[in-house]
């Protein structure tokens, strides 16, 4: 197909080995690791090919909420510099949505969509579905992330120490009068 290069088996193997080695170094001996880097969606084809055993979980959330959360979060990573311009965030988010649609079409049944709002409204039900999808045994600790004491390397370190709660997807609405319609672009999503 146009724009597709042949798969280089050596490069895939090298990527796989380097990535798994890096995970082992950071995982403190854990066998299950979540890599939640914001740009991961760009590499789902590579991940699916080089790491066929990997589960791809796509957390879907209100577009306006995602854009606002990115805009108001300080990221030390230079690759997230687009987060300091609302126009750049909106453009980036459109690209993200287009690429995720492509991945869903290119890899049917390979990506598990987890609806953020549904998770906050029906935590146990949605968490049980996710755990079942992953083929893991249920553990009641899944319902109490605030009690987990292991280290977590994330910009949202404070959030992962809190109970699952509703309302964060509405936070942007407090600032709507000052955004001059910037997030209205996602009108179907912003009710």
Q: Which residues fall in each region the model found?
A:
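Conserved phosphate-donor/acceptor-positioning beta-strand/loop module used by diverse small-molecule
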Residues: 47-71
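Short N-terminal helix/helix-N-cap motif within the alpha/beta-hydrolase-1
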Residues: 42-45, 68, 124
């Amino acid at each position: 197909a146009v724009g597709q290069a042949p798969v280089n088996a050596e490069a895939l193997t090298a990527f796989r080995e380097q990535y798994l080695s890096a995970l082992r170094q950071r995982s403190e001996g854990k066998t299950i690791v979540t890599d939640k880097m914001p740009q991961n969606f760009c590499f789902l084809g590579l991940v699916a090919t080089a790491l066929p055993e990997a589960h791809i979980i796509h957390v879907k959330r209100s577009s306006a909420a995602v854009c606002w959360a990115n805009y108001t979060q300080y990221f030390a990573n230079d690759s997230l510099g687009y987060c300091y311009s609302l126009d750049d965030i909106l453009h980036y988010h459109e690209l993200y949505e287009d690429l995720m649609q492509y991945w869903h079409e290119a890899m049917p049944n390979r990506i598990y969509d987890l609806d953020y709002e549904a998770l906050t409204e029906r935590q146990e039900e949605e968490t049980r579905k996710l755990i079942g999808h992953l083929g893991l045994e249920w553990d009641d600790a899944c319902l109490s992330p605030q009690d987990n004491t292991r280290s977590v390397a994330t910009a949202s370190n404070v959030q992962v120490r809190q109970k699952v709660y509703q309302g964060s997807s509405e936070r942007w609405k407090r600032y709507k009068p000052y955004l001059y319609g910037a997030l209205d672009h996602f009108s179907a999503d912003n009710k």
